[in-house]
Amino acid sequence: AVAQNADVVIIDTAGRLHNKINLMNELTKVKRVMQKVVADAPHDVLLVLDGSTGQNAFEQAKQFTAATEVTSLAVTKLDGTAKGGVVIGISDQFQIPVKYIGIGEGIEDLQVFNKYEFVDSFFK
């Protein structure tokens, strides 16, 4: 990224399950390597949670926050029966703001999180 003069680097950790210790250790190593190049990296760590996983999302948030210091959340799959209520507890317990929600599969379905609309959706 430095050689390319890139301002933004996106690292997709798809497949890094919180219960796979070796993969989580690799994620921690990626963070350390980045900090050798840019001392205060990473600047933003977005944890994407599946809104249909329920209470398992708490453990995911705990493990990923310990490994990478998550700075914001996105919750996906809120277009089905999942309401994603667990995200309220995660945001509160770990003091991580929710930035985005996913309500479908298209790019237009990734929306900026609105807390008022989110709460209203529980009563519809």
Language-model segments: which ranges?
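P-loop/Walker A NTP-binding module and the surrounding RecA-like catalytic core of P-loop NTPases
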Residues: A1-K124
